C-alpha cells in the first residue's frame, strides 16, 4: 500500500522530470534527450533497489529497523512499477506508430 510520503515523492519526481524535459515548451532543444531521461530513470530505479538491498542486509545483521526496510522495499516496488508502466506505454506507442500507413 502506498503511503502519502511515497506518493509525494512520486509527484515531486514527476514534476522534476517534466520541468527538466521542457514539457509544454514546444520543440526547444534545450531539454534533455529522451535517451538520457530514460537512462536517469533506470539509474534511479537501480539506486532504489540498491538502497533496499542495503537495508535488508543491515536488518539481517541487526543494524536496521524493520520499518526502514519496509519503506525501502515499498519505494523500490513503486519505482519498478512505474518503470514497467512507462515501458508498456512506450511499446504501445511504438506499435501504434508501426501500424500507421506511410
From Swiss-Prot:
Pfam families: FliE (PF02049). The keyword Glycoprotein does not apply. This is Flagellar hook-basal body complex protein FliE 1. InterPro entries: FliE. Keywords: Bacterial flagellum. It comes from Bradyrhizobium diazoefficiens (strain JCM 10833 / BCRC 13528 / IAM 13628 / NBRC 14792 / USDA 110). GO terms for molecular function: cytoskeletal motor activity; structural molecule activity. Transmembrane segments: none annotated. It comes from the Bacteria. NCBIfam families: fliE, PRK00732.1. Belongs to the FliE family. GO terms for biological process: bacterial-type flagellum assembly; bacterial-type flagellum-dependent cell motility. Its main location: other.
